[in-house]
Design a protein with these regions (language model features):
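ASCE RecA-like P-loop NTPase motor cores
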Residues: 1-180
């Protein structure tokens, strides 16, 4: 998280956006102040950097324009540890997919929880960017919601344009809807 945040600070993002980062061991007051930044709607785009699977990945509701996108870096795989390896070995002995139960499923659960922060009501609109080639693997795609079957595989060269086209197309749809 620190290195990604550092790169953002050095990029053009810092010139056009406000950047905030989740701090380790945030107390309740700091967490509320962090979330309030999203609700303020200051006019300048806000980009928040959070740890996948942390306190901000579930149990928060930022509806409307408070949160219009999430960029998830990595598939959320847990660290290799004795507990995970025991789970893996158990399911492997059962002729089941030990790696999936120990690592893939918990990781993808974190991804889905974080992505679920974007669309909280029927009126919410937003983008979910999954930044890792592993999301294109069949085993990972099979764990994503059916509604996500329409997606774009982008890279750093065309990501901005695809997002711009999405939001411009959305605006055009609203105009056409209002005219009819």
């Amino acid at each position: 998280l620190t290195s990604v945040y550092g790169m953002a600070e050095q990029s053009n993002l810092a010139l056009v956006s406000e950047l905030i980062v989740q701090e380790p061991s945030m107390e309740e007051r700091s967490r509320e102040a962090f979330l309030e930044k999203f609700r303020e709607q200051s006019g300048k785009p806000l980009i928040g950097f959070c740890v996948l699977g942390s306190i901000f990945s579930e149990g928060i509701d930022l509806t409307g324009n408070s949160l219009i996108g999430v960029l998830i870096v990595g598939t959320g795989l847990p660290q290799i540890c004795n507990e995970r390896e025991v789970i893996r070995a158990y399911f492997d002995r059962q002729q089941k997919k030990g790696y999936d139960y120990a690592y893939r499923y918990p990781g993808m659960n974190k991804v889905l929880q974080a992505a679920g922060r974007v669309i909280r009501t029927a009126e919410d609109v937003g983008t979910i960017l999954l930044m890792d080639e592993r999301f294109l693997e069949r085993d990972n795609q099979s764990l994503l919601p059916e509604e996500w079957e329409s997606y774009y595989a982008v890279n750093r060269n065309n990501c901005g344009q695809v997002l711009e086209n999405f939001w411009n197309g959305l605006d055009n749809d609203k105009v056409a809807e209002a005219e009819s």
